[in-house]
Regions:
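Hydrophobic, helix-forming membrane-interacting segments
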Residues: 1-20
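Intrinsically disordered, low-complexity N-terminal regions enriched in serine/proline/glycine
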Residues: 12, 20-23, 68, 202, ...
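Short N-terminal edge-element motif at the start of the domain
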Residues: 19-110
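Non-cytosolic coordination micro-motifs
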Residues: 91-231
Length: 231
């Protein structure tokens, strides 16, 4: 009997180790996969990297569709059109230790340019930006902006946001003016607040166009409704 119990315990240990390894490999593959996608690629390419989405939505009348993925360290949002071409994707961090690279953006550190990552303030990414929207409800605060990349980013928009479904890299700061905020209010907010979300638009895209049809980053209530939050 003692031998049998020991054998069961050993098998359980092996299974736990295998589960940990498989989860680690899956997570590592997902994180590495972020550097393998961009707008303009096929949605099938995205599925080949990340697998089937945990949630999908379709706005058939507008010709755009959304896949949502949830991994240990981040949410991934992918928007594509009727031609199966990705027109937008965003990453929202779920872990303050997870600081993914931001496409097209570099910082000058120690006499050299290095890839920018999440974990810095809005102002550190760009001295100026274009305000999109911000809101404050009884449940959450959010904020979103974009910068136009021009030639270095192949004429795309790069989006940043504080998404309430994501992690707080720094103490939450509330924008004092949320409807048509003044430049003074924006500057004060951007100096101390940190985005937890970045998004990449399509070539020659419009911030009022298909690329933001589903918003920027996973919807707060959609995130709360995922199976991972049930138990």
């Amino acid at each position: 009997m003692a031998f049998f119990l020991a054998l069961v315990a050993f098998i359980g240990y092996l299974n736990d180790g295998a589960d940990f390894y498989n989860n680690y490999v899956k997570q590592k593959r997902a994180e590495d996969g972020l550097e393998m996608i961009n707008t303009g690629v096929s949605i099938q390419h995205v599925k080949s990297i990340f697998g089937p989405p945990i949630r999908e939505e379709h706005q058939l009348d507008k010709g755009v569709h959304q896949y949502l993925y949830s991994f240990k360290n981040f949410y991934l949002q992918v928007v594509y059109d009727n031609n199966n071409t990705v027109v937008f994707f965003s990453v929202t961090s779920k872990n303050e230790e997870f600081k993914p690279k931001i496409p097209y953006l570099t910082r000058f550190v120690d006499d050299k340019f290095v890839s920018s990552t999440l974990g810095h303030t809005f102002e550190e990414y760009s001295d100026s930006s274009n305000f999109i929207w911000s809101s404050l409800t009884s449940k959450f605060f959010d904020y979103y902006e974009y910068i136009y990349l021009g030639n270095p980013g192949n004429y795309r928009n790069l989006y940043f946001g504080f998404n309430p479904a994501g992690i707080e890299y720094s103490e939450t700061v509330i924008l004092s003016e949320r409807e048509n905020p003044s430049q003074v209010a924006l500057d004060k907010f951007r100096k101390s607040a940190s985005p937890n979300t970045y998004g990449v638009g399509e070539y020659l895209g419009d911030h009022n166009g298909p690329e933001t049809m589903f918003g920027i980053g996973i919807d707060y209530y959609n995130a709360r409704d995922l199976p991972e939050h049930l138990y």
